Amino acid sequence: MAELVSVAILGYLLGSIPVGFLMGKLRGIDVRRYGSGATGGTNVLRTLGPWAALFTVLCDIGKGLLAAYLGERLAGEWGFVAAGLLASLGHSYPVWLRFRGGKSVATSGGVMLLHYPLAVLVGIAAGALAVVPTRWVSLGSLTASLAVVLQLFLLDAPLSHRLLVVALAVVIYVRHWENMKRIAAGTENRLGVKARPRA
């Protein structure tokens, strides 16, 4: 039990590293004051541009992957689950930023990348297919998440892994609740729209 608690804390701390926020600070910009207010790749793209967004996404993937690897290495199968889930939660709710972070898509993808790289790639492809006609990045994120969940159930993955991927999807969908309402209303921001200062 002590090992699980330790890797869960480690996962949270890794996940809570606010890469997007730090990228903005390097340029004197607080990304939380623009667009959606999130610190993840999409809002960084709209606020700081493509290169900052690419770096942010890669680092966010790396956080999840490293947390999952260390969790499994130190505490086995359930260590992978605990560290992976807490990395995702840490990204969305970082203590350093008063629990206002990103939306956990890239970090969750990094977690699942450890054991299911093909499923993650298929999820990315499914997400891209959703983005191309709509230009709604949020819809692509939701589609990708669901695609990975479905694949793990079709693959008959271990129960612990299926529980993890469902939990990660729940985090992603909760964090995208406002996006889903805007999608339903047809008012969601489309890819290419620059972030505006928040009121």
Curated annotation (Swiss-Prot):
InterPro entries: G3P_acylTferase_PlsY. It is a multi-pass membrane protein. GO terms for biological process: phospholipid biosynthetic process. GO terms for molecular function: acyl-phosphate glycerol-3-phosphate acyltransferase activity. The chain crosses the membrane at residues 4-24, 51-71, 77-97, 111-131, 152-172. Pfam families: G3P_acyltransf (PF02660). This is Glycerol-3-phosphate acyltransferase. It comes from Symbiobacterium thermophilum (strain DSM 24528 / JCM 14929 / IAM 14863 / T).
